[in-house]
Design a protein with these regions (language model features):
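Short functional linear motifs
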Residues: 32-35, 61
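Basic amphipathic alpha-helical segments that dock to polyanions
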Residues: 35-41
Length: 76
């Protein structure tokens, strides 16, 4: 089975908003490979380290909010 990692990354980025705290900081509780790809795309800070959270970049926050609305919000 071929996996489209960009779609997975979009879902992970959107779901990171569920653990948002202290501004643009989010808990890093997702697959490490997906988190590394999001970092390589410039959407989050480096996930490697002891800290249990990462920071969404301005671009990452904007994209995460848009994806969350598109994927998970209902239309009135």
């Amino acid at each position: 089975m071929a996996i489209i990692t960009d779609r997975i990354d979009d879902c992970v980025l959107a779901l990171l908003l569920l653990g948002r705290h202290d501004g643009q900081r989010v808990w890093k509780s997702f697959d490490w490979a997906a988190m590394e790809r999001l970092h390589e795309k410039g959407l989050i800070s480096d996930p490697v380290g002891r800290v249990k959270s990462v920071v969404l970049t301005d671009e990452g926050l904007e994209k995460a909010e848009r994806l969350f609305r598109d994927l998970f919000e209902t239309n009135p």
